[in-house]
A protein has these predicted regions:
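GST-like domain detector, emphasizing the conserved glutathione-binding G-site
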Residues: 1-136
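Loop-centered beta-sheet repeat module
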Residues: 154-167
Length: 167
């Protein structure tokens, strides 16, 4: 199994933690520009972090169904409770974390200069490895792109920033 992702990715971290806990062998590869723009969209229809290529050539994305699939195909202790009530509560917490907590994570990652610098540097070094383009240029491009997507793109403005930080 090859896991394509980014070390800074919220969801890559979730999936890698699961694989390590279950002691499932995998090879991690940074999701470079070619994979991001060409291979992953062709194989999956959209680019998500992480994307997984199985040894038989099939591809998967979206951490929750990937974990469910792996749980069904492997013996051993499960991260998914067998008790229906516990299972429901576990999935509810996971859904909340996946769908709602990543937004504040992105806000704090990209809204403040020191965090933006660090996150932009990590992504520029790992993902956007383009020959001839200095790290500072790649970092700035990523920081601008991510801020537009995950801060202003999520509707954060100067007038509602205080409310966003209070929630």
């Amino acid at each position: 199994m090859i896991v394509y992702g980014a070390k800074i990715s919220y969801f890559t971290g979730k999936f890698e933690s699961y694989l390590r806990w279950r002691e499932i062998d995998f090879e991690y590869r940074p999701l470079d520009i070619r994979m991001y723009r060409q291979v992953i969209p062709r194989e999956l229809g959209a680019t998500q972090f992480p994307s997984v290529e199985l040894s038989d050539g099939r591809w998967m994305s979206d951490t929750t169904p990937m974990i469910e699939w792996l749980e069904q195909s492997r013996p051993g202790p499960s991260v998914i409770p067998s008790d229906p009530v516990q299972r429901y509560l576990s999935l509810l917490v996971e859904d909340y974390a996946d769908e709602w907590l990543w937004r504040p994570a992105m806000y704090y990652r990209w809204s403040f200069a020191p965090d933006r610098f660090l996150a932009g540097s990590r992504l520029a070094e790992e993902i956007v490895r383009v020959r001839g383009i200095p790290l500072a240029v790649r970092r700035r491009w990523i920081a601008t792109r991510q801020t537009k997507l995950f801060v202003s793109g999520d509707g954060v403005t100067d007038s509602n920033r205080t409310h966003v930080e209070g929630t």
